[in-house]
Regions:
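An amphipathic, hydrophobic-aromatic interaction surface with interspersed Lys/Arg
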Residues: 1-144, 149
């Protein structure tokens, strides 16, 4: 992990990644000035920062491995999934998904959840729901359900 962090000297971290909240980690992933995000367009950032966080924690890979994938190009499937995404609503949908894991009522509360706890809950709650083509359908259904309320 330390070796990986040192490979991004243009973005010094104020505290260890696993002591950050979900909100703080998301801010780093969406920061316009960070080394990682300069390589991505806004749609790709939204897709990777939230979608990949779910994907890699669900598959129980280490956070360092997840972060290293930020440097890789998107697969054709990922490009298709991120194409045409409205950034604010996509981010809101993913945060609402976070909220559902914790049975919370506000996104503000979800953003304060420690990232380490979030990853543990994801591992325990959705380990059987491997990231797949169906995952976007599940998110879309949740989004429609939320809009109806």
């Amino acid at each position: 992990m330390q070796e990986f962090i040192e490979s991004f000297p243009s973005y010094p971290l104020e505290k260890p990644i696993l002591s950050m909240t979900v909100g703080e980690f998301s801010e780093i992933m969406l920061d316009e000035d960070s080394y990682i995000t300069k390589m991505l367009n806004p749609k790709e950032r939204a897709y990777i920062a939230f979608g990949r966080l779910h994907q890699y924690s669900i598959e129980m890979k280490g956070l360092a491995d997840y972060l290293k994938t930020m440097q890789l190009k998107l697969t054709p499937e990922e490009q298709a999934a991120s194409r045409g995404v409205d950034l604010p609503s996509f981010v809101e949908r993913m945060l609402l998904d976070t909220v559902s894991f914790f049975h919370l009522n506000s996104m503000a509360e979800a953003e304060k959840i420690p990232l380490a706890d979030y990853l543990v809950v994801l591992k325990d709650s959705v380990a059987t729901a491997k990231y797949s083509r169906n995952y976007n359908k599940i998110l879309e259904q949740k989004s429609k359900t939320h809009r109806k309320k």
